[in-house]
Structures are given as structure tokens and as C-alpha cells.
Amino acid sequence: YRTAGSVAETATGDMLYREMKAIGLTDVTRDTFSLDGWEFEKAVLKFTDDSGQEHTFQMGGYQTNFETDGFEDYELVYLGKGTAADYEGINVKGKLVMVEINQRDEWWISFPVYQAYLRGAAALIAVQANGYGEIAESALNAQDIAGPDFAPAFSLSQADARILKRSLRNKISACEDNTTDSEDTHNTPEQDAALLRRFSLKVSLDARSRVIPDTT
């Protein structure tokens, strides 16, 4: 992302200044001001399914702090809409929590993100179910976080989330030898959470997202 206060945005401003001077403009200035900057370099999630196929998901980011030293291993759990009730009886300490939210019609991402932080999760991964996610199943969203930078969050597409949820359903089938309910792809997030919340997936995450307070 080339956001305000980032190295890329500063370099772009310098380039425009040089180009304007080069074409002969004379009243050209570079003015500085202070703001909270954000450097988002990457957020790559890797997952190997039960058949041995490796999936690589490119995620989007929000204005929060989260950095790994290359790929680091995590457990990933799915908790519906990420409400307080969805966490009942589930230990998410140090885990990645994936939720499906509708920021347009329900609530902003800051609420499930802070809930995940209070529960000790490593980060929240938001999937836009309807609302801002209606443009395409492969779309990544990144709005203003409207929350603290120490409660990290990422964005995952509906298409990629479906692969992870399918693997969680396969775990239910393997454990309970019952595929009828677990294969229902028309479940609401609440119904899916009730089925899938007891299981987790092993994933790897390589991410670098850094908020830079009061930069110029």
C-alpha cells in the first residue's frame, strides 16, 4: 500500500517535485506536516490441506502493528461474526481468529478486532460477508480500523476463506463420520461457527504491518 506517511508515498512526492521542476514549473514547493503513518508490506498466509495441496493466500491489512520473522506457525480458528458469545468455551490465546463481518449493515471491524485482542488472539482475519465484500468473491477490503494499533487485523477474500472453512468441515467429517451438516455451504456465519469453532487449522503467516506515530 502507498499510504500517507509511508516511505513509498514520500518517494512519490519527491518524484513529483523533481518532475515538476524538470518541466519548467517555478512555483513548486515541498511542504511537511505531521501525521500517523502506516507501512504495510505484506501479509501472506500459507496452508496445506488434507490432500497435501499447499495454498497461498495474499491478505490485505489494516492500520495496526504486526510483524513476523518470516513465516511463523499459528493455529487458525473460525468464530462466526466474532461476537463475545462466539468465544464462549473457546481458547484463542496466540491463535489467528477468522470471522465474517458485514461492515455496511452491522458493525465496524473495530468491534470484533478488539474482542479478539481481549481474548488474547494473535490477530483477527476479517472476511467481508456481503456489504463491502459484494464487489467480488476475490476482493480484499481495507477500511479505516477506528481502533488501537496494538489489536492487529488482516483482510481475507471470501474465496480464500471458503477453502479454509471447507478444510474445517472435513475435520468434522473425519471425526464424526457425518458429512450432512458440515458440508452445508449455505450456512449463516452463526451456524458455521457452531459447527466449526471446535476445530482449528495449522497455518503459517508472513506479515509486516507497522504504524508510525507522528511522522512527517
Residue ranges and their predicted role:
Residues 14, 37-41, 106-110, 132-139:
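Extracytoplasmic/secreted cell-surface and envelope-processing proteins
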Residues 30, 79, 99, 126, ...:
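General beta-strand structural signal in soluble alpha/beta enzymes
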Residues 84-91, 95-133:
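A conserved hydrophobic secondary-structure block that centers on an alpha-helix together
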Residues 56-89, 143-216:
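Soluble metallo-hydrolase cores and metallopeptidase-like ectodomains found primarily
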Residues 11-19, 111, 115, 120, ...:
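Extracytoplasmic/secreted proteins, especially bacterial periplasmic and envelope-associated proteins
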Residues 1-5, 16, 21-27, 101, ...:
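Sec/Tat-exported extracytoplasmic proteins
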Residues 1-96, 103, 182:
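Noncatalytic luminal/extracellular "stalk/propeptide" segments of secretory-pathway proteins
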Residues 43-46, 137-147:
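Short low-complexity, flexible loop/linker segments enriched in glycine and/or proline
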